[in-house]
Swiss-Prot record:
PROSITE patterns: ZINC_FINGER_C2H2_1, ZINC_FINGER_C2H2_2. GO terms for biological process: cell division; negative regulation of transcription by RNA polymerase II; protein ubiquitination; regulation of cytokine production; regulation of immune system process. It holds the Pfam family zf-C2H2_6. Pathway: Protein modification; protein ubiquitination. Residues 128-207 are annotated as: Mediates dimerization and DNA-binding. GO terms for molecular function: DNA-binding transcription repressor activity, RNA polymerase II-specific; RNA polymerase II cis-regulatory region sequence-specific DNA binding; transferase activity; zinc ion binding. It comes from Danio rerio. The gene is e4f1. SMART domains: ZnF_C2H2. This is Transcription factor E4F1. It is an enzyme of class 2 (transferase). Residues 98-109 have a biased composition (Basic and acidic residues).
Length: 719
């Protein structure tokens, strides 16, 4: 069907009655000239001018005419089928013994039977399908493409062959386009730039997602970074011409080409990006045979470097020419950190300051500092920079520094006041989607993070890290006002509010302010409700003429009645004087603020609950609330500690008061009541179980409930 004539390919069209099949068969030959083929009409041109004129003309259309001559790749027989006549074409192709179909799928070639005796001598054949729109259809995934070249490239994605290998990290890819996109990660080339904010991206898809994001790109943070990239010595064969600098800076840009002893050329590039880019940056183009070197120079990075005083020494040591280097000595203001590209790990470097990277097993790279393993050398380089404190990306809002631009981008979400992400379980809103995923673990019963020192387990990794500090007694967060240390930064923030008096959380019912959001929630969930106008009690004798100053140390309520109540208020508790049970005027003049509650049990219980709720809501972090009962023949001891609130209740109310306090701190309930017998008396300790992050600690046969707000409750029933 196909005849070979010297070094040219002849095409014969085989038409059947049932289908239109174009079968093109070519043989190998010596190609003396370059052939330019049109992707639409598949026409070939030997002259470049004729090919360009053909592309500019509008007469070029994709044809489905079976008479059109198509010249495929060398040694490949191509059969183009129409999707409408696919069934009839298959029958014709099977009947013809000289045709041989090849179908590419996952790297395997399925060949039909051939009547030819010498199967190896006949060229292979690839079947392309055309749909009604004139697009080529993939047999495996049914995707359509404009040209056969694009379809042929697409077929490599269904194969296991990875013939395109990165020269820097030896990662293999199926297509050349994937390799080019991968190399941009090494060179940091970002050719796709947003016209609104000036932010650049490595891939066009990333730019498209950026333009379609929920938040419009009105203001984007630009980063100031300093980089040094090392490439092989053979990669640079031309002199490097830097871009012209800005005239107002009075600096001469220099790209220093340094010849090292390890056959490595060092290129120092300093990138300085302004807040608002008024003019587009001019990229410096360098003719270089090496693709990596050309990508580095043509990546759009502004080569705005300052000359160093060592430029003269570099010029003397290296035979390479340095263009634009000044003769005068200047100083560099940026700290240069060298990033080395180690191609052969077995070779030992002469510099003793650089530690040797040890490859482990199947291309795993181990960090010499912390024994962590990485799949690629590039990840290891970024990780090692964190050990040496190299953090070139700086937040302009809080001045924090980060190792990579991606981490800085995630950090910038914390400065956004809008909370766009909402938890579907509890309705809590967050600024970042990652915070929602971390929060969702609180609604599950899984505790995957176990402590290696004890048997405790936690739902989040951060909670486990905070718990580890309890074993090491590590409190890295120190208050600048009182030098008190905390294990969590959030605890320090809440503590500082007590110094500053800040109460950002307001109650919508009574208008009271709270320093913490959790305290406001507990205030709203209190059993007695929100008492905004509670000034006195209906069933308590209260003197309206009595004035109590903020310097009063305590107020004591004593009675011989076994149901009497003793309440000791600390002087550091704010606004508690209005809830002190008043005494007669003549007793107050003697300095003894004592009142006796002589009423029925129900009225006294109601009053105690109100007082307890007010005490807990107005007490701040660092207080210790002790609940104990008082008998008729017992004289209660009054603590002189300024951080203690003692509430002595009758035996019948101790358990109820303890439960109220537990609810005030966190949704706690009384679980068990255990009795511990001693020589003379028996003590009953009320054990409470509270919500998460509130620990129950046993201290001297008593239970202390410790909450994140640094408030401790000690409940003891004395029988």
């Amino acid at each position: 069907m196909t005849e070979e004539n010297n070094n040219t390919a002849a095409t014969v069209t085989d038409q059947t009655e049932h289908s239109n099949i174009i079968t093109i068969q070519t043989t190998l030959g010596d190609e003396d000239e370059d052939i330019h083929k049109c992707g639409k009409c598949l026409a070939e041109f030997s002259a470049l001018d004729a090919f360009i004129q053909h592309k500019l003309s509008r007469s070029c259309k994709r044809t489905q005419d079976p008479q059109t001559n198509v010249v495929p790749n060398e040694g490949v027989s191509v059969e183009v089928r129409s999707s409408e006549n696919e069934c009839s074409s298959d029958e014709t192709a099977t009947a013809n013994g000289e045709k041989q179909d090849a179908k590419v799928a996952s790297g395997d070639k399925k060949r039909s039977r051939s009547t030819s005796e010498d199967e190896s001598s006949s060229p292979s054949k690839v079947v392309w399908k055309l749909n009604t729109e004139g697009r080529y259809v993939c047999d495996i995934c049914a995707k359509t493409f404009k040209t056969t070249n694009i379809l042929r490239t697409h077929m490599f994605t269904h194969s296991d062959q990875k013939n395109f290998v990165c020269e820097m990290c030896e990662t293999a890819f199926r297509t050349k386009g994937s390799l080019i996109r991968h190399k941009r990660r090494h060179t940091d080339e970002r050719p796709y730039r947003c016209n609104q904010c000036g932010l650049a991206f490595r891939e066009s898809g990333a730019l498209t997602r950026h333009l379609k994001s929920l938040t419009p790109c009105t203001e984007k943070i630009r980063y100031s970074q300093c980089k040094e990239i090392l490439v092989s010595k053979d990669g640079i064969r031309k002199e490097v011409q830097p871009s012209s600098p800005e005239p107002e800076k009075e600096q001469i840009p220099v790209v220093r080409v340094v010849e090292a002893g390890q056959e490595i050329i060092q290129i120092e590039v300093v990138e300085e990006v302004q807040q608002v880019a008024s003019q587009p940056q001019t990229a410096t183009v360098v003719e270089a045979d090496n693709l990596i070197c050309q990508a580095i120079i043509n990546s759009g990075i502004a080569l705005e470097t300052e000359a160093t005083e060592a430029a003269g020494q570099v010029e003397a040591q290296s035979p390479k020419a340095v263009l634009g280097a000044p003769e005068t000595e200047t100083r560099i203001t940026e700290i240069q950190v060298t990033e080395e590209c180690v191609e052969t790990l077995a070779e030992e470097t002469q510099d003793s300051s650089v530690k040797e990277v040890e490859p482990v097993q199947s291309k795993l790279y181990k960090c010499p500092h912390c024994e962590r393993m990485f799949k690629t050398l590039n990840y290891l380089r970024v990780h090692v920079k964190g050990h040496v404190g190299y953090k070139p990306f700086k937040c302009l809002t809080c001045q924090k520094e980060f190792l990579t631009g991606y981490v800085l981008k995630k950090h910038m979400e914390t400065h956004v006041s809008e909370r766009r992400y909402k938890c579907g379980e509890c309705g809590k809103q967050f600024k970042a989607i990652g915070h929602v995923r971390e929060h969702m673990r609180a609604h599950s019963d899984e505790r995957p993070y176990h402590c290696s020192f004890c048997d405790k387990s936690y739902k989040t990794k951060n909670a486990l890290q905070v718990h580890h500090r309890t074993h090491a007694d590590d409190k890295p967060y120190v208050c600048q006002h009182c030098s008190r240390g905390f294990r969590e930064k959030s605890a320090l923030v809440r503590h500082i509010r007590h110094h500053t008096g800040e109460k950002p959380f307001k109650c919508s019912k009574c208008g009271r302010g709270f320093a913490e959001h959790g305290t406001l929630n507990r205030h709203l969930r209190a059993k007695g409700g929100c008492f905004a106008q509670l000034k006195d009690c209906e069933h308590v004798v209260n003197s309206e003429e009595q004035e109590v100053t903020t310097e009063s140390v305590s107020t004591t309520i004593v009675s011989d009645d076994p149901h009497a109540v003793l309440v000791e208020f600390s002087s550091v508790v704010a606004d508690t004087q209005e809830y002190i049970i008043g005494a007669p005027a003549e007793e107050a003049a003697q300095g003894e603020e004592v009142a006796i509650i002589q009423d029925n049990q129900q009225q006294m219980d109601s009053h105690i609950m109100k007082v307890v709720q007010q005490i807990v809501s107005q007490s701040h972090g660092g207080h210790q609330i002790i609940v104990r009962n008082v008998t008729a023949d017992e004289t209660p001891g009054i603590s002189d500690s300024g951080d203690t609130i003692t509430i002595a209740t009758p035996e019948s109310l101790t358990e109820q008061v303890a439960m109220t306090l537990a609810n005030a701190i966190s949704d706690g309930t009384i679980l068990t009541t255990t009795t511990e017998d001693t020589d003379e008396t028996s003590h009953t300790t009320v054990t409470m179980v509270t919500a998460e992050n509130v620990e129950t600690i046993e201290q001297e046969e008593q239970y202390v409930i410790a909450s994140p707000e640094e408030v401790e409750i000690q409940t003891v029933v004395v029988v």
